[in-house]
Amino acid sequence: MASSSTRKYETRKRDPNSKIAALLVIDMQNHFSSMAKPILNNVLTTIDICRRASVPVFFTRHNHKSPTDHGMLGEWCNGDVILDGTTDSEIIQEIQGQVTGPDEMVEKNTYSAFNKTRLQENLEKIGVKEVIVIGVMTNLCCETTAREAFIKGFRVFFSTDATATFNEELHEATLMNLAFGFAYLVDCDKLRRSLLGN
């Protein structure tokens, strides 16, 4: 059964195709653990479903290596950015074991997983035409990545129950906006049915 948010906001229905899809797990890091922990089981479930369906999985890690790469985030966050090499920058322990190779990790220093990374190139190289977005924060890095994926020509599926942010109001605003113009909404149950047939 679809989650209430999926039913409430979805405007179009479509299932992802495991042959051309990839999963993007956004910023499941210690810095965001208060938001990430409540959705951890759904994130792990989604990763498991995708692995069982032979859907490639990519993880992002947000971090800053020097003051020169802070960009507007430095101003917006009053300099409180995630610094590389700190505990805050590390992927949370429960997710670390899911990362199976260096090609799966995308290092980024802004909201988008596509900006100044090789993500698009790596997706296109393996024939990916659809992306499934999960992780944190719903309304910042997840939403920006989803919107940019759409603009770049990828079909986007956005999880309602494996994404999270500061509060439900911001979370639902993103779901409403993405469903209106950028993404098909999915949840763990819908992904299980569409990718595994059960």
UniProtKB/Swiss-Prot annotation:
InterPro entries: Isochorismatase-like_dom (IPR000868), Isochorismatase-like_hydrls (IPR050272), Isochorismatase-like_sf (IPR036380). Pfam families: Isochorismatase (PF00857). Keywords: Hydrolase, Pyridine nucleotide biosynthesis. It catalyses: nicotinamide + H2O = nicotinate + NH4(+). GO terms for biological process: pyridine nucleotide biosynthetic process. Signal peptide: none annotated. GO terms for molecular function: nicotinamidase activity. It is an enzyme of class 3 (hydrolase). Pathway: Cofactor biosynthesis; nicotinate biosynthesis; nicotinate from nicotinamide: step 1/1. Its EC number is 3.5.1.19. Catalyzes the deamidation of nicotinamide, an early step in the NAD(+) salvage pathway. Prevents the accumulation of intracellular nicotinamide, a known inhibitor of poly(ADP-ribose) polymerases (PARP enzymes). Belongs to the isochorismatase family. This is Nicotinamidase 3. It comes from Arabidopsis thaliana. The gene is NIC3.
